[in-house]
Amino acid sequence: MLRTEHNDTLTFITQPDHGRLAGMLAAHWGNASFTAAGHYGNPAHADRLRGEVLLGIAEHDNGWWEWEADPSVNTETGLPMGLGEVLQDQQAGMDRWHIGTARFPTHPYASLLISWHAYWLYAIRVVDQPDARFTHPLFWKGAPEQLYPGALDLPKEFMSGLAVTQKRLEQNILDDECGASWLGDDVIKPNIRLLQLCDGLSLALCSKLIPATSGITNGLGSD
């Protein structure tokens, strides 16, 4: 739940709805000057790949479906917990990612993108010198421990499990006639980065979570 106070008004936006906005942004990404989603590199059947990429971006937070249907409540305020409150429970967050990466078994490429999205959210704390190209906009100004607090043992174990999931998903993709061309670094890495970027843009429009590059972070599309 993205809970934002703005102009004396409380706004609540569910994680799945924010995800769909990210998918809409991705669907409109690209023009004559830069590449559309799914068309990076030289993939076979790029339009079909585009559908997988858009699904992965739009449903990157699908693991929240069950929680959002019956959200936890802050006992002091009586309001649904915001994202920062909910993420204090590391194990529950990882359980949601397990659900999210398994939701669409007939769409392994979309699921693979979701798994890489999860990987890079945790890598900012766990991996020594993580690749800055995949750093989520949430962390462009640092302080990942605010959203992902606690010891590192659980995240490390989770990321090891993600690696196993990714190998399985990659094999499922390779079973498709287009699979090999879809997994090349020049194809999949830009799609992962696009997910990170569209997620960040959607969060900036829906909340105050993304820090402004300068001045005060306003949220709700005002930055």
Segment roles from a protein language model:
Residues 1-223:
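Metal-dependent phosphohydrolase cores
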